[in-house]
C-alpha cells in the first residue's frame, strides 16, 4: 500500500511540475529544453514527490477546500488563456489542447488541495508563544496606539518629503478643476441641471469639496502646493490613525504580540501603504473607512455595544456611503447579514441601516438636485453590456443588421464602436455614451443586446472575462502605485509641482516597483492573490464552523463584485480597500480561531 501511494505521489509530482513549468500555445506545449530548464523540472518534480508523499494522504479531505482548490485550478487555466490569447482557445482550441489543459488542472488541483489542507492544519494546531517584548518595545504595551502612530509616521516621512505636496491622479485633478470652476470631461458625460454648476457627482461630492476646498485655500494665499499639502496632512492623519487603531485593537483583543508587530511592520514598510497615503485619490480615505468598518463589525458580532458605540458606528456607515459612490453596496451587502447572523443586534443595526439608507436617498434624490448638482451617468453601471456589444461589433459586425446598428448608434455611437473596443478597459466605449439617451432607446438597445447574446453567447462571455480575469488570476499584473507628477493642473495654469528631490523619488519609486516581486510579502500587491486570500479565508471560516464571522469578509466581496461590473481589468485602486483591511482581518480571524480551539 505504501509503495502504491509513493507511485501515485510520484505521478502527481510530475503532473504538477508540468502544470507549473509548461506553457500551452496554439501550436502545442512550450517548454525550454536547456539543461537548466530540464534540471529545474527534475528538482521541482522530486520536491513535489517528497511533499505529496508526506502530506497528500495525511489530512481528511474537506469538501469546502476541494471546491476552492477546483476554483483556483480553473482560474489558473482559464486566466492563462485569456491573459495570453484574449479568449478560451488555449483551453478548448483543439483536442490536444483540451487534454493538456485537463492535465494542468489536475496538477494545480492536487497542489492547491494539499497546500490548503496543510495550511489549515498549521493554523489550527501551531502555537506561537507570546514572549515578553524587548525593553525598547515595552512602550508598545503601554501606548499601543501612540507607539504605532509614531512608528508609521517615521516610516512614511521619506515619502512625505519626497512627494511634497502630494501625488495627484487624473480624477483628483478634475475634482480640483470642478471646484475651481473649470470645465471637465465629467460635465460632458452627464445632463447638467445648471450649466454654471461645475461640480458633478461623478466623484463623491464630500471628497471633491475636501480636496478642491483645500486646494482653493492654497490658491487664495498664492501657493497651491501648500493647499495640496494641507490635503495630504488630512489624509495622512486619517490613514495612519486607522492603521494605528487597528494595531491598538489587535492588542486589545489579545492577539499574539509578535504577530501584531508583523502587521505594524507591514503597514509601515510595505510601499503601497505610504504611496497611497501620499496620493490624492478618493479611494484612500474610503479604504481606511472600510478597514475601520471591518474592525467594528467584528466588535459588534463579538461584544455587547453601548448606545454611544452604535451612534459612532452609524456615523462610520454614513461616511462610507458619502466617500465613495459605490459605498452603499458595501453597506447593503453586509449589514443585513450581520442582523441575520446575530439576533441580539437586529434592532439597533436595523435602525442604523434604515437611517443611513434614508440619508442616502435624501442626499441623492433631494439635496443634490436642489443644489443643481448633476448625478453620475448610468453609463458607469453598464460597462459589461457595452463591452459585449463593442466586442461583437469588432469581430462580427457584419452580422448586425442595419436597423440594429441604428439602435446601437443612438446609445453608443456605432461607426467606430469596434475600433474603440479595448478588451480590458471600457472607457473608450462608454465615454461615447449618449447622455440624452431616453428610457425607450435604452430599452431598445437591451432588446438588441439580448438578441445577439442568444446568437453568440461566447462573444459576450469573452468580453466579460477579458474585463475581469485579472482580479482572479495571480499570474497577471499591472501598475499598482502612482509615482509621477500629474500634468493636468499645470496645464490648467496652476503651479503644482514636486520639489527637487528627484533622486529620493527615484529610490522610493524603484522600491515600490520592485516590491511585488518579493516572495510572500509581495503578494499583497498582487490583485489576484488578494482575492484568493479572501476566498481562502471564507473557506477556513466555513470549515472551522465560524460562519458568524463571514460578515467580516462581505465588505471585500461586495467591492470585488463592483470590480466585476466595473470599467477596468486589474485596476489596483479599485481593490485597495480589500488590501487595507486584509492584514488586520487575517489576525482578527486567526485569533478568534485560536481562542475557540483553546476553550
Model-derived features with residue positions:
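Transmembrane-helix motifs of polytopic, lipid-linked glycan transferases
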Residues: 110, 114, 230-254
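Short acidic/glycine- and proline-prone juxtamembrane loop motifs at membrane-interface regions
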Residues: 170, 275-285
Amino acid at each position: 500500500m505504501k509503495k502504491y501511494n509513493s507511485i501515485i505521489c510520484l505521478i502527481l509530482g510530475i503532473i504538477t511540475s508540468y502544470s507549473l513549468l509548461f506553457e500551452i500555445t496554439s501550436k502545442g506545449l512550450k517548454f525550454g529544453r536547456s539543461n537548466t530548464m530540464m534540471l529545474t523540472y527534475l528538482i521541482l518534480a522530486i520536491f513535489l514527490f517528497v511533499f505529496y508523499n508526506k502530506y497528500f494522504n495525511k489530512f481528511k479531505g474537506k469538501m469546502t477546500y476541494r471546491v476552492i482548490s477546483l476554483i483556483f485550478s480553473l482560474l489558473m487555466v482559464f486566466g492563462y488563456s485569456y491573459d495570453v490569447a484574449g479568449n478560451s482557445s488555449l483551453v478548448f482550441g483543439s483536442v490536444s489542447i483540451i487534454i493538456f489543459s485537463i492535465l494542468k488542472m489536475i496538477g494545480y488541483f492536487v497542489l492547491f488541495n494539499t497546500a490548503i489542507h496543510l495550511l489549515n492544519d498549521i493554523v489550527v494546531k501551531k502555537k506561537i508563544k507570546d514572549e515578553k517584548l524587548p525593553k525598547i518595545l515595552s512602550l508598545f504595551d503601554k501606548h499601543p496606539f501612540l507607539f504605532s502612530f509614531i512608528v508609521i509616521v517615521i516610516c512614511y516621512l521619506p515619502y512625505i518629503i519626497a512627494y511634497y505636496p502630494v501625488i495627484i491622479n487624473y480624477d483628483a485633478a478634475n475634482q480640483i478643476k470642478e471646484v475651481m470652476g473649470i470645465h471637465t470631461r465629467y460635465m460632458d458625460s452627464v445632463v447638467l441641471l445648471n450649466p454654471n454648476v461645475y461640480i458633478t457627482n461623478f466623484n463623491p461630492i464630500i471628497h471633491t469639496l475636501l480636496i478642491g476646498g483645500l486646494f482653493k485655500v492654497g490658491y487664495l494665499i498664492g501657493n497651491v502646493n501648500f493647499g495640496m499639502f494641507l490635503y495630504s496632512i488630512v489624509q495622512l492623519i486619517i490613514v495612519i490613525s486607522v492603521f494605528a487603531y487597528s494595531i491598538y485593537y489587535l492588542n486589545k483583543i489579545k492577539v499574539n504580540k509578535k504577530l501584531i508587530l508583523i502587521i505594524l511592520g507591514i503597514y509601515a514598510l510595505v510601499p503601497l501603504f505610504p504611496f497611497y497615503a501620499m496620493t490624492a485619490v478618493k479611494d484612500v480615505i474610503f479604504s481606511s473607512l472600510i478597514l475601520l468598518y471591518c474592525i467594528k463589525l467584528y466588535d459588534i458580532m463579538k461584544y455587547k455595544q453601548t448606545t454611544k458605540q452604535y451612534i459612532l458606528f452609524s456615523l462610520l456607515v454614513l461616511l462610507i456611503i458619502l466617500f465613495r459612490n459605490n459605498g452603499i453596496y458595501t453597506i447593503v451587502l453586509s449589514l443585513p447579514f450581520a442582523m441575520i447572523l446575530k439576533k441580539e443586534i437586529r434592532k439597533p443595526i436595523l435602525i442604523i441601516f434604515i437611517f443611513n439608507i434614508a440619508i442616502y436617498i435624501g442626499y441623492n434624490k433631494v439635496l443634490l438636485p436642489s443644489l443643481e448638482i448633476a448625478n453620475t451617468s448610468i453609463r458607469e453601471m453598464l460597462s459589461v453590456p457595452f463591452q459585449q456589444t463593442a466586442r461583437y461589433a469588432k469581430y462580427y459586425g457584419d452580422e448586425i443588421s442595419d436597423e440594429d446598428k441604428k439602435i446601437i448608434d443612438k446609445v453608443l455611437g456605432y461607426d467606430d464602436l469596434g475600433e474603440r473596443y479595448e478588451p480590458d478597459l471600457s472607457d473608450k466605449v462608454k465615454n461615447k455614451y449618449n447622455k440624452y439617451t431616453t428610457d425607450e432607446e435604452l430599452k431598445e438597445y437591451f432588446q438588441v443586446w439580448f438578441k445577439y447574446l442568444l446568437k453568440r453567447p461566447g462573444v459576450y462571455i469573452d468580453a466579460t472575462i477579458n474585463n475581469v480575469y485579472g482580479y482572479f488570476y495571480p499570474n497577471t499584473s499591472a501598475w499598482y502605485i502612482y509615482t509621477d507628477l500629474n500634468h493636468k493642473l499645470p496645464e490648467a495654469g496652476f503651479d503644482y509641482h514636486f520639489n527637487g528631490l528627484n533622486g529620493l523619488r527615484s529610490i522610493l519609486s524603484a522600491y515600490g516597483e520592485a516590491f511585488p516581486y518579493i516572495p510572500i510579502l509581495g503578494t499583497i500587491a498582487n490583485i489576484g492573490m488578494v482575492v484568493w486570500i479572501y476566498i481562502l479565508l471564507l473557506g477556513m471560516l466555513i470549515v472551522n464552523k465560524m460562519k458568524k464571522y463571514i460578515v467580516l469578509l462581505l465588505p471585500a466581496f461586495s467591492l470585488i463584485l463592483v470590480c466585476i461590473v466595473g470599467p477596468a481589468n486589474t485596476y489596483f485602486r479599485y481593490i485597495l480597500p480589500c488590501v487595507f483591511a486584509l492584514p488586520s482581518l487575517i489576525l482578527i480571524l486567526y485569533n478568534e480561531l485560536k481562542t475557540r480551539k483553546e476553550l
